[in-house]
Regions:
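Short linear sequence motifs
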Residues: 25-27, 38, 61, 95, ...
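N-terminal Lys/Arg-rich, disordered targeting/topogenic segments
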Residues: 1-15
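N-terminal module-boundary/linker segments of secreted carbohydrate-active enzymes
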Residues: 2, 20-79
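Short, His- and charge-rich active-site/binding loops that engage polyanionic ligands
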Residues: 63-124
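Domain-level detector of nuclease and nuclease-like folds
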Residues: 106-260
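Generic hydrophobic, helix-prone segments enriched in Leu/Val/Ile
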Residues: 10, 34, 41-48, 102, ...
Length: 260
């Protein structure tokens, strides 16, 4: 209510002061141009994802955070894509305590909050990973990974097992092979729409993808992509779900103990 009253007061002031309106439009235009043409490009590898089939509801609003960027679907109550960059972590990097709470994102008008997942049978699954982001980018960036616009429904057997192993491998192994690793990740949906039993606003994904682009010191790019179904078994090998592998053994024998 206070926020609505504040917005109403600001609008009333602007309408009664035409010069203020012109200044507001100018500042807003410059801010938008900076966001779209400069800021976003620094946080995405090869640009913002585009829809290949306009018949599919893929409209997203883009939210830029300290260490990752989100293409969020209000229709599905899910991030359709999240992009972040990994680099080799410093040996002196602080291991920060995990935040206790998930938070509604004000940019989503608080439409989805943590309670939407309560008693749903699904975990609040991070797309931009808490641990890696905290090691590389610090406390504020870590807190932002607990925004609900970074969260998607994952079965506990996936979120706490195979998906977690993927996050460990990308941070510990992939970053040791490349100068930097760009990651695009998000949920996939089939034609049948199913929502959380605890919320009619959050659609349940059928699978999840991760696309890795590893940049070598000489600029060579190696690509790896995986699609992991929601019902993946906890002891499945990650190699089973590779759909693109141009990474010359990016998942090598040393890691295979972790991939079982």
């Amino acid at each position: 209510m206070r926020r609505l009253n504040l917005i109403s007061s600001i609008l009333t002031f602007v309408i009664r002061n035409p010069k203020a309106l012109l200044i507001a439009l100018l500042v807003g235009g410059l801010s938008y141009s900076y966001e779209v043409f400069i800021a976003r490009d620094t946080m995405a590898f090869a640009g913002i994802p585009k829809a290949m089939d306009n018949s599919i509801p893929t409209y997203t609003r883009i939210f830029r955070n300290s260490a990752y960027m989100v293409g969020y679907s209000d229709i599905k109550g899910n991030p359709l894509w999240v992009v972040y960059k990994l680099t080799p972590p410093s040996e002196n990097a602080s291991r920060l305590k995990r935040p206790e709470n998930f938070n509604a994102d004000w940019r989503n008008f608080g439409f989805i909050d943590s309670n939407d997942y309560t008693n749903s049978g699904y975990d609040r699954g991070h797309m931009a990973p808490n641990h890696a982001i905290s090691l590389l980018y610090g406390k504020q960036a870590q807190i932002e990974t607990f925004l609900m616009t970074n969260i998607t429904p994952q079965k506990p057997s996936l979120n706490q097992k195979l998906w977690q192993r993927l996050e460990e491998i990308e941070l510990e192994s992939f970053t040791s092979k490349f100068k930097e690793v760009w990651v695009y990740t998000g949920p996939l949906f089939d034609e049948k729409i199913t929502h959380l039993k605890s919320s009619r606003f959050v659609e349940i994904p059928d699978a999840f993808y991760k696309i890795y682009a590893g940049i070598e010191e000489n600029g060579t790019i190696k690509v790896l992509a995986v699609i992991v179904p929601q019902n993946a078994k906890t002891n499945d090998r990650i190699e089973k779900y590779i759909v693109i592998n141009e990474a010359s053994g990016i998942i090598h024998h040393q890691n295979r103990r972790q991939c079982h």
